[in-house]
Structure formats: C-alpha cells, structure tokens
Amino acid sequence: PKDYYNEKSSNSVKIDTNSNKAINKAIKKVIKKNKLLTNQNVKQKLTDFGIKNKEEKILIRTEFGDIKIRLYKNTPLHRANFLLLAKSNFFDSTIFYRVIRDFMIQGGNSDKNNMLQKMAKIGLYRVPPEINSKNIHKRGALAMAVQEQYYKDPTKINLSSSPYNFYIIQKGPLSDT
C-alpha cells in the first residue's frame, strides 16, 4: 500500500524534534522584513503563508515513534500557523510536557530559554478562533490550546488560540461542555 505520509509528497511536512535545520526561506523573509506576527497582522500574514504552503499532512517524529497528523483546510489560519512553526523548526527539541491519561498530550512551547528566543523571532500574537462543528475532538485530533490568561478570568473569555501550544486528543470524542 502507498504510504500516505510519504516524505516526498508536496502536501506533507516532517517535524523532526531532534534536528537543527536551517530556517525555511519563507520564514527568513518574514523575519528580515520586520514582519513579526502581531495580533494586528496575524490574519493577513497567516493567510498569505497558507496560500504559499499548502501542506495538509504532518509527521511528528519522537523518540517513542511517529505521529501522523492531518491539518484541516477549513481552519486555514491554524493550519498555516502550525506549518509556519514547523517549517521554522520551532518545535525541534521541544517536548510533550503535559500528558493526561485518556484525555490528551500537550506540546509545543516549554519553559526552555531557547523557546523565548524562538518566539521573539516569530512574534507575539494569538490565532483568531476558527470554530467549526465538523471538526470533532476525537482520538488523534490536533488542536491549539486556548491562551491561558483568558480562561483564568471568566469575564474576559477569548477563544483565540495560543500559537505555540498544541495538543493531541488521546480519547474521544470530547464535548465543549
């Protein structure tokens, strides 16, 4: 059978958590032109990046095995954000730092000093919500975490996603209630 996540496919990206590759050319352009991502420009920047980077399949390599992920087309900002971070090697050498049995595993940003340096090169921003009832939180689903500071105060609920934190559902489907 054909390997759906063949690394030669133009629609796939590999995330190697142990590599130290050079930053993708598209990312270098964003950084060089002082085009850091901000809350004011995030929609346009991610839309432009998503148009140029059409991959929908991700392979996350870990010391415990590979994880195959498909990114939804109907969440173009989240898809583009994950691709941007993957292609800029943001996730390299990161860890899954939160594991809740039968619920989820969370990775991306961590408390390592180099993570702050990586974020400074990309920008400080949130990804606008792209909630779609067709995208179900079921086993294997990839999602971006909600910004922590917003759910500590229920009067300031904001469904924007943290650009640097993601989680993978272990068991589901899950409801939002």
Each model region followed by its residue ranges:
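Cyclophilin-like peptidyl-prolyl cis-trans isomerases
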Residues: P1-T177
